[in-house]
């Protein structure tokens, strides 16, 4: 899998920010994941859409092992189609959205949240935009 994008979060993650990933699902292969990383090598949040099962999986890697997976059957990707995934977070949860859907809510298992200092997006699909930015106000029913 090719490394498409990396970002360093000076001071670590803080509530009020979001990660936006837009691209084109070139094939039906499971070759797309986003990882929120700590300096220790742990992964505070791992999100992986799985075309093979039409699910989105969330997990965390702590102390050398994966925790229990959280699986969502809301699948925002289709082969040959553009996609948009937004990840935001607060002190308690990571929130994953696709247009018109809340895909997943995953508990923050790593404390403190600010210990998460890097974001890495791995993908063999074509990514048009990967942006780490302050979240603006949103009017509508997206849940935030």
UniProtKB/Swiss-Prot annotation:
The keyword Cell membrane does not apply. Pfam families: Gal-bind_lectin. Gene3D superfamilies: 2.60.120.200. Signal peptide: none annotated. The modification Phosphoserine is found at residue 138. One of its GO terms (molecular function) is carbohydrate binding. Homodimer. This is Grifin.
């Amino acid at each position: 899998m090719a490394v498409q994008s990396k970002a360093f979060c000076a001071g670590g993650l803080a509530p009020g920010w979001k990660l936006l990933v837009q691209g084109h699902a070139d094939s039906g292969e499971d070759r797309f994941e986003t990882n929120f990383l700590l300096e220790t090598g742990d992964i505070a949040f791992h999100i992986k859409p799985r075309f093979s099962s039409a699910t989105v999986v969330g997990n965390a890697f702590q102390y050398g092992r994966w925790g229990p997976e959280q699986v969502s059957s809301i699948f925002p990707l289709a082969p040959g189609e553009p996609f948009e995934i937004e990840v935001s977070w607060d002190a308690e949860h990571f929130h994953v959205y696709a247009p018109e859907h809340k895909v997943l809510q995953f508990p923050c298992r790593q404390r403190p949240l600010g210990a998460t200092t890097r974001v890495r997006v791995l993908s063999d699909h074509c990514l048009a935009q990967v942006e780490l930015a302050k979240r603006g106000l949103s009017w509508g029913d997206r849940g935030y």
